C-alpha cells in the first residue's frame, strides 16, 4: 500500500467512526475520536521539530500545558466576570474559541522562541535535558499557582463558543477539531516539500554542510521549533476545552513522553504517523486499561517492537508490506 493511500484511509476512518457513533447514539465514542484528533494534532506539532528538524524535545508538554492554561485562565475569568488584569488597562476573559486559540498559539510560540533560543545552542542529550528541565519548571510553577487551582487544577463549567456551531454537541466539536487537524496536516505536507522544509531536513541530516553553503542552521531550527510549539499549544487549548479542565499534569514529563510515543509509534516524519500513533494509544488505553492498571507494560512492549523491527513506525511497516 502506498503511504498516500494509507493516509487517506486513516483520515477517512477517523471521520467515519464518530459519524457511525452519532447514528448509533454513542457520544462516548465521538468523544474518544475527538481526543484522538486533538492528541494527533499535538503529535503533528512535535513532528515539525522531531520529524523534520531532528530535534528530540522531551519538554513539549510545556507548550501543550501553556495552550491548556491559556484556555483555562481566559474562560474562568469570563465565567466569573472578573478581569485577568485591571491596572493601566483592563484585560478580560473570553468564551470565544477564536480568541482563545489566538492567545494560546501566541503564548506557545513566544515560549518556544525563548526556550528554543536558549536550548538550540546545544545539541544531543544536552538539548533533550534542557527542554525536559523547562517542562518541569512549568509543571512545578502551576502546582504552586493557587490562583488557578494549584495542584488540584482548574475546572471550566462551560464549553467555549465558535461562530455557527453548538460546541456542546459532541459531533460538532469533533468536526471542529478534525477540521483543524486536516488544516495543520496540509500545512505540514506543504512545508515538507517547500524549500524551507528541504533545508530543515538537510540540517537534521548534515548540519555542517548546510552551514557551509551559507544557511543558518540555528535560525532554521528555531523557526521550526516555534511552529512546533504553536501547534502543540493549540492542541492543548482544544484538549482543555474537551475536558473543561486543566491541571499541572498537562505539563508533566509523562505527557511529553506520550506525545513522543504518538510520533514514534506512527512513524517519525510521516504525515499521518501521529494520527495512527494517537489512535493506537487511545485504543490500547481503552481496551487494556479495563483489563489491567498496568496496561502501559503492553504499550512499552509494542513500542519496543516498533522501534526495533518497524523502521518508519507502523506507517512504514504497513506500506512496506503492501509494497512487497
Language-model-detected regions and their locations in the chain:
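Transmembrane alpha-helices and adjacent helix-loop boundaries
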Residues: 1-324
Amino acid at each position: 500500500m502506498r503511504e498516500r493511500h494509507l493516509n487517506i484511509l486513516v483520515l477517512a476512518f477517523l471521520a467515519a467512526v464518530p459519524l457511525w457513533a452519532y447514528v448509533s447514539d454513542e457520544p462516548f465514542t465521538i468523544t474518544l475520536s475527538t481526543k484522538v484528533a486533538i492528541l494527533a494534532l499535538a503529535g503533528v506539532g512535535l513532528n515539525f521539530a522531531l520529524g523534520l528538524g531532528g530535534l528530540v524535545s522531551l519538554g513539549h508538554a510545556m507548550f501543550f500545558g501553556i495552550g491548556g492554561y491559556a484556555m483555562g485562565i481566559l474562560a474562568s475569568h469570563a465565567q466569573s466576570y472578573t478581569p485577568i488584569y485591571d491596572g493601566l488597562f483592563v484585560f478580560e476573559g473570553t468564551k470565544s474559541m477564536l480568541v482563545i486559540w489566538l492567545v494560546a498559539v501566541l503564548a506557545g510560540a513566544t515560549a518556544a522562541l525563548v526556550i528554543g533560543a536558549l536550548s538550540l545552542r546545544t545539541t544531543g542529550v544536552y538539548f533533550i535535558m534542557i527542554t525536559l528541565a523547562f517542562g518541569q519548571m512549568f509543571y512545578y510553577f502551576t502546582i504552586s499557582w493557587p490562583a488557578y487551582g494549584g495542584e488540584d487544577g482548574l475546572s471550566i463549567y462551560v464549553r467555549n463558543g465558535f461562530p455557527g456551531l453548538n460546541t456542546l454537541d459532541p459531533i460538532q466539536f469533533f468536526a471542529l477539531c478534525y477540521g483543524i487537524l486536516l488544516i495543520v496536516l496540509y500545512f505540514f505536507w506543504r512545508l515538507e516539500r517547500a524549500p524551507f522544509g528541504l533545508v530543515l531536513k538537510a540540517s537534521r541530516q548534515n548540519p555542517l554542510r548546510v552551514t557551509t553553503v551559507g544557511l543558518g542552521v540555528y535560525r532554521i531550527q528555531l523557526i521550526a521549533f516555534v511552529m512546533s510549539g504553536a501547534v502543540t499549544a493549540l492542541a492543548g487549548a482544544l484538549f482543555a476545552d474537551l475536558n473543561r479542565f486543566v491541571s499541572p499534569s498537562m505539563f508533566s514529563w509523562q505527557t511529553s513522553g506520550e506525545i513522543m510515543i504518538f510520533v514514534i509509534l506512527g512513524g517519525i516524519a510521516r504525515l499521518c504517523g501521529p494520527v495512527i500513533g494517537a489512535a493506537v494509544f487511545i485504543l490500547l488505553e481503552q481496551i487494556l486499561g479495563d483489563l489491567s492498571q498496568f496496561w502501559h507494560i503492553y504499550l512499552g512492549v509494542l513500542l519496543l517492537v516498533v522501534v526495533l523491527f518497524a523502521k518508519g513506525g507502523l506507517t512504514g511497516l504497513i506500506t512496506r508490506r503492501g509494497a512487497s
